[in-house]
Amino acid sequence: MSSSKVYGYKYGLGSCLDQDREQSIWPSIKKEELDAFIFLGDNVYGDLPSGELSKMQRAYQIQKTRLPQWLMNEKEILAIWDDHDFGLNDGGGDYPYKKEAEKMFLNFWNIPQSDPRRNREGIYFKQIKEIDDVKVEIIGLDTRYFRSKLKGKKNAYERNEDSSATILGQDQWAWLESSILNSNADIIVILSSIQILATNHPYEKWDNFPLERKRLLELIARASRKITMVAITGDRHKSGIYKNENFIEITAS
């Protein structure tokens, strides 16, 4: 976990950046004069139906040449992954190459060897930053590495109500609950590759595992009594703002 104090800090948000497609958005983003950018997953499209990682290596090599130098060299970068940079479309914890994919992800984003992510499973992390005397804690989740199998067919997934089914896995859950309940931040921003509040579509979302979603929303509700809670999500190739009582979710994709 890192901590720092800054003034007038500005974040950009985004997800789903195919290395083989046009990226004409960057000049417009540069005009925003950002201090940091948060990549919310599918930061490359390197997955194959077989799950093998030969395309992933190529995808990262290409993306390294596509991402603007002013962004990668001058701005703070935070990143989580989703299925296409995890290595298997809609993949989860049973993906056999996930350890290799994790190493490729950490190397691409220049995560230091001293970072906790280098010494445990999963790419989840947290960062505390004091911005204009407001303490902001950013919590990045890994919704892939530990996730149970989806139920139903692709693009028509059903709710998996098995009490043993998980998105985050036991260790990440313990870390998340401890992080949130012991936080002294004014604002907590949760980064999740898949949507939390949206339920009215047949694609991947927290509601595919309703008990996990319930647990997360109860944790957020408990924390929101004293902390402003916000989530940022991706995946959907669209943008939106969702609200549940005092909890706001922003989808940027």
Regions found by a protein language model. Name each.
Residues 1-253:
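Metal-dependent phosphoester/phosphodiester hydrolase catalytic core
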